[in-house]
Amino acid sequence: KSFGIIDSLKKEIQKCKLEPRNHKKHEKTDYKLSSKIITSIKNILSHYKIKSSDITCIGFPGITLEHKPSKKRSSYLGDPNMIASKTSLIVISDFRQCDIDAGGEGAPLSAFFHNYINKKRKDFITFINLGGFANITLKSGQKVLGFDTGPANYLIDMWCRRKFNKGFDSGGKLASKGNIHTKLLKNLLNDRYFKIKPPKSTGFEDFNWEWLQKHLSKFKSINRFDVLSTLTYFTIITIADAINEYRPESRQIYFCGGGAK
């Protein structure tokens, strides 16, 4: 069961992302988000008739405000202490910083979960986790590789909000009305991130509205449907490239996450 975030709170969260280190401005949004999460937890326990005593712990990664492992920095919205206090449950949080301090990327987190639930499998297996950004888990026996492949829904949803006044492209119906702009696609794929070898991670610090506008400015006006179609194919290509380069022998590929549908 899942609970959505109302549009007004989503807008506040987006504003916080523009100033990730202005903690004073984040206080109200942080409180609202934490309150929403607390209410959702209580609703889930009530809906499924689960006792608090049956819950071992809650994993809370928060909503990422800034993720810059090269600068030893990763921050998020949401107060785990408040959530623990109001639900009387153990809350585990701040997953990323320790790994970053040890020289890691702090992301993606899903690779640990994918490895754990499949630890007895010895065959080649691949997971693609689709959210705002896409990450991949490549598992072969005890060997596991996980990294971000690039944008998934983030650029697509952003374009839909600005150009179609829609939160997302339901069923890819809007993108299907356009054509792939091959020259724009080539420009997008030429980004330096795709030349970096894993382990690596990325986010809206690298791929955002300004980044997209920089590439669009190289061409005369492109039909909004064509841009959306190109962004969608861009996501597909970057995922396929990652599979082909690091695990071409994969025969089982599982898609998961909010964008899997």
Role assignments for model-derived ranges:
Residues 24-80:
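Short beta-strand-loop/turn "lid" adjacent to the catalytic site in phosphate-handling enzymes
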Residues 68, 184, 245, 259-261:
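Short glycine/threonine-rich loop-to-helix capping motif typified by GTGT followed
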Residues 1-27, 143-144:
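Short glycine-rich, Thr/Ser-proximal phosphate-binding strand/loop in the N-terminal lobe
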Residues 51-54, 121-123, 247-251:
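Short helix-loop-beta connector
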Residues 1-3, 142-236, 240, 250:
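Conserved ATP-utilizing enzyme core subdomain
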Residues 250-261:
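Glycine-rich phosphate-binding loops at beta-strand->alpha-helix junctions
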Residues 16-29, 166-172, 222:
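Short glycine/proline- and acidic residue-enriched helix-loop micro-motifs
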Residues 69-74, 85-167:
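Phosphate-binding/catalytic loop of phosphoryl-transfer enzymes
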